[in-house]
């Protein structure tokens, strides 16, 4: 399965940190965190199949567990990395948890930032909840500076994701619009997760943190933050005045959460 990554490092001897983006996103969603993260890690920002620079094949298995196995295989076989810390956001957070389940000897810790998959039941849906944002992205990619300045358009694209949508920088919006508009893997990856939930077993030796914002409108507490579905040894953290894409709202705090989880494994 073709995944790709962008590597950032000051020292290749620093422990590996794998970053996994969500549906319709790309590895560059993490770039505001990279300058701080490379002080402690060699960072590998993954592009999932059909997202960012990664190609999409017709025979892809796009469910979260298969994607998790593909990332581990890529890191071990292609990049030569035997042990790694992992962080993921949204569907990427679910995939990160699955990585710990499929490869507990390779994955030392997981920081799951607003992970999908933690619900009692997820009946199949006909359309993904972010479909309107994808349609808008396909249109607005051609006039992004203008769209960014029009509050109504910016609200359509981001109000479901964050109550702090007015504060998003042009760079963050530009990168996310391009990633969403051009993600050939958007629908295949959504179909791979649709109707499923996280049900895997993660050994206690893999350190886990599950982090949600208290203003998450995409995966709200009453629907999609079921502690009993997460591994029982997870450290559960709620961030005040924070929405679904935690690294947009609080990049420095996100870095600290990742570092603290990694330290638990040392």
Q: For the regions a protein language model found, what residue spans apply to each?
A:
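Catalytic histidine-centered segment of alpha/beta-hydrolase-like enzymes
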Residues: 242-255
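Gly/Ala-rich beta-loop-alpha elbow adjacent to hydrolase catalytic centers
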Residues: 88, 92, 96
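Residue in the alpha/beta-hydrolase core beta-strand immediately N-terminal to the catalytic nucleophile
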Residues: 47, 85, 108-111
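Conserved acidic catalytic loop of the alpha/beta-hydrolase fold
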Residues: 66-84
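Flexible "cap/lid" loop of the alpha/beta hydrolase fold
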Residues: 101, 110-142
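Conserved alpha/beta-hydrolase catalytic His-Asp/Glu region
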Residues: 145-202
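Conserved serine/cysteine hydrolase catalytic core
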Residues: 182-229
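Conserved HGGG/HGGXW glycine-rich cap/lid loop of the alpha/beta-hydrolase fold
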Residues: 7-55
């Amino acid at each position: 399965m073709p995944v790709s990554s962008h590597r950032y490092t000051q020292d290749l001897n620093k422990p590996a940190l794998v970053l996994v983006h969500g549906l319709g996103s790309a590895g560059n969603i993490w770039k505001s965190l990279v300058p701080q993260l490379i002080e402690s890690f060699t960072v590998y920002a993954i592009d999932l199949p059909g997202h960012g620079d990664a190609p999409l094949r017709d025979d892809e298995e796009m469910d979260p567990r298969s994607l998790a196995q593909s990332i581990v295989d890529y890191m071990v076989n292609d990049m030569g990395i035997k042990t790694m810390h992992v962080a993921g956001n949204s569907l990427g957070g679910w995939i990160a948890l699955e990585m710990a389940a499929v490869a507990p000897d390779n994955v030392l810790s997981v920081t799951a930032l607003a992970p999908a998959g933690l619900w009692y039941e997820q009946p199949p849906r006909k359309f993904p909840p972010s479909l309107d944002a994808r349609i808008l992205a396909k249109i607005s990619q051609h006039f992004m500076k203008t769209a960014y300045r029009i509050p109504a358009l910016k609200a359509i694209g981001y109000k479901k994701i964050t109550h702090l949508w007015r504060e998003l920088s042009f760079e963050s919006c530009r990168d996310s619009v391009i990633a969403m508009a051009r993600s050939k893997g958007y629908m295949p990856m959504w179909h791979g997760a649709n109707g499923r939930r996280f049900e895997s077993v993660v050994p206690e030796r893999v350190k886990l943190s599950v982090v949600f914002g208290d203003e998450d409108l995409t995966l709200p507490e009453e629907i999609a933050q079921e502690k009993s579905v997460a591994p029982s040894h997870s450290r559960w953290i709620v961030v005040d005045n924070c929405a679904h894409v935690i690294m947009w709202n609080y990049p420095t705090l996100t870095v600290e959460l990742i570092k603290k989880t990694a330290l638990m494994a040392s």
